Amino acid sequence: MDYKELYSNYNKRLPFTQLRKWYDKDKDGTKVRELAELQIDIFKSGVSIMVGRDLKNGRTVKENWSNVYGQIDTMYSIFALCKQFIQNTTQTETMKIPIVKVARDDNGKALGDSTLVNAHVIIGRNEKEFYFGVIQPQKGGVHFLLHPPMPGKQWLVAKKDETVDSLTLSKIFATNYFDRILRELDVVKDELTAIYNKAYPRKVKEESKEPEKVDNGDDLDTGLEDII
């Protein structure tokens, strides 16, 4: 097995990270129902956030999809910041986290320490829910509500037959969402470490197996023979 190739092209789907959003779109003066999706996956040892819009009948249209890619350690920290925001925020607010890339010249050479903002990860809270999304320059963004699906009366409190507070429910769902992502990334890092060590083992110089000859004086001419 070529572990170097396996390490460079390591991929893993994370299906539980998918978020969906139905929205109304104006088309020729008529409102039509459209679908947006967000999906987080591991791609070539990094983290990919795919966002698709107008997917109801356009899932296979390339222009409907955008992708944000970041190194696994960077994205791990971003998701940890999102979780911390959810746990600590006490008011309606938004946090914008930039994902940067190295700035390069026309020949592909890095321009010192200069960086460019590739996209922003958005985590926020309104009066009822937490939301999460990605904004890319010149492409806009989509906010996905962090809220479990609620068919029928699934989330009614039996005691008073009243609905559960939507903000509390959203906070629990959002915390669990980022917890699962962080746990999965921990597994990915362990797997990548194992593959990396097989692909690039540390080379240790082997010592000679032939024992050193120890001079114990047996071959010395001591002159004792003449005395004896």
Predicted segments — roles?
Residues D2-Y10, N67-K96, L167-K198:
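DNA replication sliding-clamp ring fold and its partner-interaction surfaces
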Residues E93-V134, G140:
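Intrinsic, low-complexity N-terminal interaction/targeting segments
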Residues V51-Q71, M150-L167:
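A cross-kingdom feature marking solvent-exposed beta-strand/loop segments within repeated
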Residues T60-N67, L116-H120, G141-H143:
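Short, mixed charged/polar active-site loops
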Residues K31, S48, L55-V61, N107-K109, ...:
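Short, surface-exposed beta-strand/loop "edge" segments at domain boundaries and coil↔beta transitions
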